[in-house]
Regions:
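Assembly/interface hotspot detector across virion components, adhesins/toxins, and nucleic-acid enzymes
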Residues: 33-36, 52, 156, 179-185
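Generic structural motif
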Residues: 26, 30-33, 154-158, 165, ...
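Acidic, glycine-rich flexible loop segments
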Residues: 125-177
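Short, flexible coil/linker elements and helix-boundary hinge sites characteristic
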Residues: 17-20, 73, 123, 150-156, ...
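Generic serine detector
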Residues: 29, 59, 109-111, 155, ...
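A structural detector for beta-sheet-dominated domains
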Residues: 50, 64-65, 129, 157-159, ...
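C-terminal, beta-strand-rich globular interaction domains
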Residues: 163-210
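Extended, low-hydrophobicity segments enriched in charged/polar residues
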Residues: 1-145
């Protein structure tokens, strides 16, 4: 388990705590774990949970100032989606390998937050603790195939003008996949993601269709 794995374990544990604690005024404490990211002055973190209606829904974090628009009843779904898209405008990310890794974790958070119906297709299982691999859908009762027991570790590589983040994960309709994306900072520290790729290392389809 490397340092990225360890931070991933902490991140998932914190996610589950935040989802389960509806009494919290804000979700700002996520950045006690993602400690290479901080909110800009006056900003707070909120969490919109998937609604169990319609053909599918997902959950996401968003930022706000003043009162939480979801709690005071002034938010609509499109407003929260817009806040989600621009969440990094209200965050300061350290330009380090660990900062890039934590930005990736936040970027992928909808895939580990609660999902409803068709949105389950985006769900991921991460293997920050390699023992978790034995608990995923196809291998609960069957041995893990030898060729995928050696799962690549998460990694972050710094290039001249960007970071490359790679992370293995499992999806019940793709199999074992290696995520790869580029993360860049402009001269003002604003962050952007591009060249997002998913390479299938071991193909699997659960057969479940929504």
């Amino acid at each position: 388990m490397n340092n990225y794995d360890k931070k991933g374990v902490e991140f998932l544990a914190k996610i589950y705590d935040l989802v389960g604690d509806e009494e919290l005024d804000t979700k700002d404490s996520l950045f006690e774990v993602l400690d290479q990211i901080r909110l800009k002055d006056g900003c707070h973190l909120g969490l919109r949970l998937a609604e169990k209606k319609g053909m599918g829904d997902n959950s996401w974090f968003y930022t706000y100032t003043g009162e939480d628009p979801l709690k005071n009843g002034t938010a609509d779904i499109e407003m929260l989606r817009e806040k989600r898209r621009h969440i990094y405008d209200d965050l300061i990310v350290e330009q380090t390998n660990m900062g890039a890794w934590q930005a990736y974790l936040l970027f992928l958070s909808p895939s580990v937050l609660p999902l409803w119906w068709h949105e389950n297709y985006i769900g991921r299982t991460f293997f920050f603790d390699r023992e978790n691999f034995k608990g995923i859908f196809p291998f609960r009762c069957e041995p893990v195939p030898l060729k995928i027991q050696d799962i690549p570790e998460p990694s972050v590589t710094k290039r001249k003008d960007h970071f490359i983040v790679r992370c293995p994960n499992w999806n019940d309709w793709e199999g074992l996949v290696l995520d790869s994306l580029n993360l860049s900072f402009d001269e003002d520290g604003n962050i952007s993601f591009d060249n997002f790729k998913r390479k299938v290392l071991y193909e699997f389809h659960s057969g479940i269709c929504f």
